Amino acid sequence: MSKLHLYGWLYRDSDKMLCVGQNRKPNILRDKNIIEEIEKIAKIKVDTTEGLGGRRTYIPNARMRVYAIDDVCNLDEAIGSLVDKLYGEMFTNVRNTGYSEWTITGLHVEDFRIGGHDLNAELDRYIGQYIHFILEYED
């Protein structure tokens, strides 16, 4: 499986798109739009009759994880903070503030939905926090 790993401070840009940046203050020239980054790796287009019909971007066999943390950290520290929150056996310098995982047979990129989950709404609760966003998919 291949992996897309985005990390940074989560916010919405002026177009209300979810982005991650390395500073708390947004910088649209450097920061990454999550949906645009996913579209770069999506290779499958499917026909649809929804709305006006046409073709939509779709990633089969997708698995997504989001770690939300109170401060800048690497992925290992983010995972450690979740373990610490659940079991109290790890000592980390950051505090886990949220975790979500979705394993469904496909990700609809334009709608930003996986299964019946609206990822825009799901990720809204992490706005303003440092996140590690991981999408694993088959090539």
Task: For each feature predicted by the language model, list its residue ranges.
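Short beta-rich binding modules
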Residues: 2-125, 130, 135-139
